[in-house]
Amino acid sequence: MYAIVRSGGRQHKVAVGDVVEIDKVADEAGSSIELTPLLVVDGESVTSDKDVLGKVKVTAEVLGETKGPKIRILKYKNKTGYKKRQGHRQKYTQVKVTGIEG
């Protein structure tokens, strides 16, 4: 059994026991969160109906926070001497899926 869940505007394929990195959430390590299911596949049946998915719960335990790779951004304007260099590291929260019920 697995589910497609939405978190932070992105979709992740999860099953029970999977560790997934989602966009940063404000919950502390050790707390439990609920993820929004978009699709649930249970062996032979596929469920994507909103009424049925309203009863399905995907729970996960927050393990901690991590950072993604450093991304370097360079803006350059020709003939004016304008250059701007900037860096960015996306923050993620690691969660472990504890259950898909419903």
UniProtKB/Swiss-Prot annotation:
The keyword Cell cycle does not apply. PROSITE patterns: RIBOSOMAL_L21. GO terms for biological process: translation. Transmembrane segments: none annotated. Keywords: Ribonucleoprotein, Ribosomal protein, RNA-binding, rRNA-binding. This is Large ribosomal subunit protein bL21. GO terms for molecular function: rRNA binding; structural constituent of ribosome. The gene is rplU. One of its GO terms (cellular component) is ribosome. Part of the 50S ribosomal subunit. Contacts protein L20. HAMAP family: Ribosomal_bL21. Belongs to the bacterial ribosomal protein bL21 family. InterPro entries: bL21-like, bL21-like_sf, Ribosomal_bL21, Ribosomal_bL21_CS. This protein binds to 23S rRNA in the presence of protein L20.
